[in-house]
């Protein structure tokens, strides 16, 4: 008689979880901005005089991993000419199981009451000036940010703060100033390589006292 060994419940659950993950291949789409999204952006995040028109932007939808180990659906508004390349980047991040905390349109563009209380929103397009280093004061540089063109992404801003002269404007991110102790959601060399594969640079590689660890862009600035 052949004996059938019963697997421990924990092992069964682990196998099932791994099977579920394996059955969820990466997927992504790119499409023009829907009418409602155009309306939501107009006035607060886009206005006449911005360096790109709404028709030059695309809605990028991607699968990504959350901090809880589940697969989620995230969305970004990005420049039309960069959308397909970014699909490849997020596929690589998915394969790395790199966690992204918040990446929904309502997190970025919704009313203040609907945004995550802790921030940490991964986003791309926003018609605004570049933000000066924490080393200096002020809220704008007088120059368009790469975000104003949809050609930059800020990835997990809490875990990857904008740092200048050893400090950051986000007090909650101060515990991530020490980049030698790697924690979930922090940018790794593999993440940098995913973006560099399409020619994008990383703010964490800037020389001098200012580093923008969240920031990836077509120009590297």
What are these regions (language model features)?
Residues 104-148, 160-162:
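Active-site-adjacent loop/helix surface patches within enzyme catalytic domains
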Residues 21-70:
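N-terminal module-boundary/linker segments of secreted carbohydrate-active enzymes
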